[in-house]
């Protein structure tokens, strides 16, 4: 496999031109391209250019609205909901985060929920932005089933990632972003593409057997939670907070 080195600016330009050519307006293309560039900068290959073909596929199929405009609805002074109108989640968050920060500063605490959007992408850029404004930030999201609970062999939870950021005046914030699965599915897919094995305990084959083959996990297999039953419990917490608290479907209802 051959590779072509690109600067961060070249990555941004490539992503933006590709998205514009496939149905995105300028605002959407710029938001997504900035996220892709930052993911590549921070070494998160599964959220960088690797994601571009999936975005293009979603745009071409009509599943993703590349020109949609999210709509804000304030449920209370400290609870904000954004209707995504089938935009990609980073576009929806870009609309809601300023309102969230304002509400948190005015009330001491605030919550932002988004729905009818696609692919949350990396969450740390957004929690980091909030921490840079002096706010403590926590984010989580659910998705379609890909992770078997501890002791099971069939998927029930999404990879259900969480991100946390803590402000440090005059210094960079403390930030983390992690899947509650043993590994993000995107990282498994990257390992498959590059021909790498994954650690034992990452996932199971479609027959429920342990494997180090990322292809056997990504193609019909299942991921495992990190930390056994502890990771399962945190994945369940995310499911309840990110979905059912805001009347969205749970992961096991994704295809219903």
Regions found by a protein language model. Name each.
Residues 196-245:
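Secondary-shell segments that build the walls of catalytic and ion/ligand-binding clefts
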Residues 81-169:
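A generic, well-ordered mixed alpha/beta core segment in the N-terminal half of proteins
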Residues 26-37:
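Short, well-structured alpha-helical segments
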Residues 147-215:
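Phosphate/diphosphate-binding glycine-rich loops and adjacent basic-rich segments that engage nucleotide
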